[in-house]
UniProtKB/Swiss-Prot annotation:
Belongs to the glutamyl-tRNA reductase family. Pathway: Porphyrin-containing compound metabolism; protoporphyrin-IX biosynthesis; 5-aminolevulinate from L-glutamyl-tRNA(Glu): step 1/2. Homodimer. Its EC number is 1.2.1.70. InterPro entries: 4pyrrol_synth_GluRdtase, 4pyrrol_synth_GluRdtase_dimer, 4pyrrol_synth_GluRdtase_N, GluRdtase_CS, GluRdtase_dimer_dom_sf, GluRdtase_N_sf, NAD(P)-bd_dom_sf, Shikm_DH/Glu-tRNA_Rdtase. It holds the Pfam family Shikimate_DH. One of its GO terms (molecular function) is glutamyl-tRNA reductase activity. NADP(+) binds at G190, A191, G192, Q193, T194, G195. This is Glutamyl-tRNA reductase. During catalysis, the active site Cys acts as a nucleophile attacking the alpha-carbonyl group of tRNA-bound glutamate with the formation of a thioester intermediate between enzyme and glutamate, and the concomitant release of tRNA(Glu). The thioester intermediate is finally reduced by direct hydride transfer from NADPH, to form the product GSA. Possesses an unusual extended V-shaped dimeric structure with each monomer consisting of three distinct domains arranged along a curved 'spinal' alpha-helix. The N-terminal catalytic domain specifically recognizes the glutamate moiety of the substrate. The second domain is the NADPH-binding domain, and the third C-terminal domain is responsible for dimerization. It comes from Francisella tularensis subsp. tularensis (strain SCHU S4 / Schu 4). Substrate binds at T51, C52, N53, R54, S110, E115, P116, Q117, Q121.
């Protein structure tokens, strides 16, 4: 059976958080998901990946028309009927799927360029697919090559070491000031796009606690709900939250300072304000125990890393392209070897039956020379039957390229 490799994706590039939340498959019974998707006609194998920034389904299928059935399956898990998957999903096919998965596992498709968490998430998805007997040989080979590629990118580049955004750079500054973030409490003010990105960076550092404060608590709750050490709060709770916090990062739209010196005591804190207009009073930095950074400080970090980022990303891309070429060459060899094996099996089948009949006749006293001549004639006819039919059909269709190919296969003169 000829199978095609495809993927369907909902990700942050096309879909905001509220859309991604609707189409997320995380939190559902994994075994049930695999049973239901594999029950769809023409779906042969599957791997389901669901993270905060994306939900993607990788599939081996026997008919491309099954895509519509898969979309219906996915839509069935959406709580709000106003969200239609056809408005948001991206379809990839063949080599594009493998290239995307390699870039994804290496962190090149992430909100945070080079972030390492995605590789672990891809590995977890692969493991769950195997556990549910949902992965086939070809898809397995794809993922093994992806993991090897990601390992090589990690060892041969510094793609995960260069701050690539205001949010990531802000966290870099915070790390410089505090030795052991795992014992610290972090307060993020604002749950917009930058606030969400800050939250993702902070979770990667595994602090003791993350507090996310926002005007509307619902948005903050959507972001924090999947994390045990995270909590959502109203902006009105800031005085109490600041007392607990060791690091305060603001990314919020306000017209006046929402954190001033009156909120803080003698406890040392790191204040990082990436809001415009500023949300944290710069005078906080004048207090001896505090460290204060604003957008200009962060931009300096970004500027320092521009060339590094470009260079490391370019190195990673070259490794991925090379790795994809290696994979495709190996797949060609596998397909070729499989075809050769099948050809020999076919030949064995043609020869064995005729040979046994011929030997039986010789054992029964028939003329051996005549039997061997007849055997050779029958084998010649059987072996050449399908090639002759193929050549006639190619000639009818004007496929001179096929004729040339078949001539080469049989060592014939292609010039005639």
């Amino acid at each position: 059976m000829n199978m095609a490799l495809i993927s369907l994706a909902i990700d942050y590039k096309k879909s905001p958080i509220e859309v991604r939340s609707e189409f997320a498959l995380s939190g559902l019974d994994v075994s049930m998901l695999y049973r239901s998707i594999l029950a769809i006609d023409n779906v042969v194998h599957a791997v389901i990946l669901s993270t905060c920034n994306r939900t993607e389904v990788y599939l081996e299928i026997s008919d491309l028309r099954v895509v519509d059935d898969i979309l219906v399956w996915w839509q069935g898990y959406v709580r709000n009927p106003n969200y239609k998957i056809k408005d948001y999903f991206k379809l990839r096919q063949g080599t594009e799927v493998i290239m995307h998965l390699m870039k994804l596992a290496c962190g090149l498709e992430s909100m945070v360029l080079g972030e390492p968490q995605i590789l672990g998430q891809v590995k977890d998805s692969y493991t769950l697919s195997k556990k549910n007997h949902a992965i086939g040989k070809e898809l397995d080979r794809v993922f093994q090559k992806v993991f090897a590629t990601a390992k090589r990118v990690r060892s041969e580049t510094r793609i995960g070491h260069c701050p690539v955004s205001v949010a990531f750079s802000a966290i870099t500054l915070a790390k410089r000031q505090l030795d052991n973030i795992s014992s610290k409490n972090v307060l993020i003010i604002g749950a917009g796009q930058t606030g969400e990105l800050l939250f993702r960076h902070v979770t990667a550092l595994a602090p003791k606690q993350i507090m996310l404060a926002n005007r509307t608590i619902e948005k903050a709750q959507k972001i924090t709900s999947a994390f045990r050490n995270a909590s959502a709060h109203y902006l009105s709770e800031l005085p109490q939250l600041i007392k607990k916090a060791d690091i305060i990062i603001a990314a919020v739209n306000v017209l006046e300072y929402i954190v001033t010196c009156k909120y803080v005591g003698d406890k040392p804190r790191v204040f990082i304000d990436i809001s415009i207009p500023q949300a944290l009073d710069p005078k906080l930095g004048e207090l001896e125990q505090n460290v204060y950074y604003c957008v200009d400080d962060i931009n300096a970090v970004i500027e320092d890393n521009k060339d590094k980022r470009k260079y490391e990303s370019s190195k990673a891309q070259k490794i991925i392209v090379k790795s994809l070429e290696e994979y495709l060459e190996k797949e060609k060899a596998i397909i070729s070897n499989s075809a050769i094996k099948e050809l020999f099996q076919k030949a064995d089948g043609l020869v064995d039956l005729s040979l046994e009949k011929s030997l039986a006749k010789i054992r029964n006293g028939k003329d051996a020379e005549e039997i061997i001549k007849r055997f050779a004639y029958e084998i010649k006819k059987k072996v050449l039957h399908y090639p002759v039919v193929g050549m006639k059909e190619a000639s009818k269709q004007g496929r001179s390229d096929c004729l040339v190919c078949m001539k080469r296969m049989f060592g014939l003169n292609v010039e005639k």
